[in-house]
Amino acid sequence: MGIQGLAKLIADVAPSAIRENDIKSYFGRKVAIDASMSIYQFLIAVRQGGDVLQNEEGETTSHLMGMFYRTIRMMENGIKPVYIFDGKPPQLKSGELAKRSERRAEAEKQLQQAQEAGAEEEVEKFTKRLVKVTKQHNDECKHLLSLMGIPYLDAPSEAEASCAALAKAGKVYAAATEDMDCLTFGSPVLMRHLTASEAKKLPIQEFHLSRVLQELGLNQEQFVDLCILLGSDYCESVRGIGPKRAVDLIQKHKSIEEIVRRLDPSKYPVPENWLHKEARQLFLEPEVLDPESVELKWSEPNEEELVKFMCGEKQFSEERIRSGVKRLNKSRQGSTQGRLDDFFKVTGSLSSAKRKEPEPKGPAKKKAKTGGAGKFRRGK
């Protein structure tokens, strides 16, 4: 789930924190990708006639096709991906996981009813709701990545938290996921739609945490409290407090404790045994990979082993897989170039689709030229 309504809230109240780019803009960038989120997207999107791709034994292969070709596309555009896989979910997430199980059970009932009624659109909708990333999906994707020469890491807990830690440490330029709580975990830059289907033609969205905090007038701990009020995977929120009201309350009172002291409990009942303090601690000090111990290396693909796995075991076309390997090898030759802004300071500012910031004048203009977007430039 991530954080409910956070993307829209940022677009509404801190639009300069969002930048849209074409994939070509990320040449030379290292990016930490939430693997489970990507695999889920592949299982949803890579389909034939509404059904997931399968081999003759009935094994699902959509995740492998998606991982293979989307990774090649990133490499061809000069992006160096590292995939981060989920570890053990935190105990605080048990309530959210139980709710998901309930929703799956309900979707199974609705799917059966839709099948009996012959309602094709409803069947497709509820089938997608039942999609779940399994250990087998993860293990097969790890094997594929190792054969492709693409690094992956196992997070001790939530993948997006470790993605954020790598970005904070400067090991990568950004964390890539659809879950907005990557910002809550402190990633300086969050990228959305990086692994989305090309057919959707979605521009990649960048969310810059420093601009979010600046425009909202909050520090990181206050931003975490705002996200808890909006609704997260780790504890309940206060019913009746919408996004705009949550922002107003945090800006005025600075913490959940101060807000609760002033709330009318008859209008805004606080959840019983509310675990907001524990959720705050989890966001501020999550269990993550140690960035200093991480060494990222992209190596040559093992063509024959890839053919053996993807064609021999999973029954993909050998011609297509070998063609993909050629593209991958060619992309590796091109990606040895660095980015110009790794050597020269880049000036400018983030643009917003919603609001263009006024051009500074006089001394302010001179100051803006020497500062600009340098604070957003990350050298990895």
Swiss-Prot record:
GO cellular component: chromosome, telomeric region; mitochondrion; nucleolus; nucleoplasm; nucleus; protein-containing complex
GO terms for biological process, alphabetical: base-excision repair; DNA repair; DNA replication; DNA replication, removal of RNA primer; memory; positive regulation of sister chromatid cohesion
Cofactor: Mg(2+)
Keyword vocabulary terms for this entry: Acetylation, DNA damage, DNA repair, DNA replication, Endonuclease, Exonuclease, Hydrolase, Magnesium, Metal-binding, Methylation, Mitochondrion, Nuclease, Nucleus, Phosphoprotein
Gene3D superfamilies named among the record's database cross-references: 5' to 3' exonuclease, C-terminal subdomain, 5'-nuclease
Signal peptide: none
Residues that bear Phosphothreonine: T336
Positions of region (Interaction with PCNA): 336-344
Protein name: Flap endonuclease 1
Lineage start: Eukaryota, Metazoa, Chordata, Craniata, Vertebrata
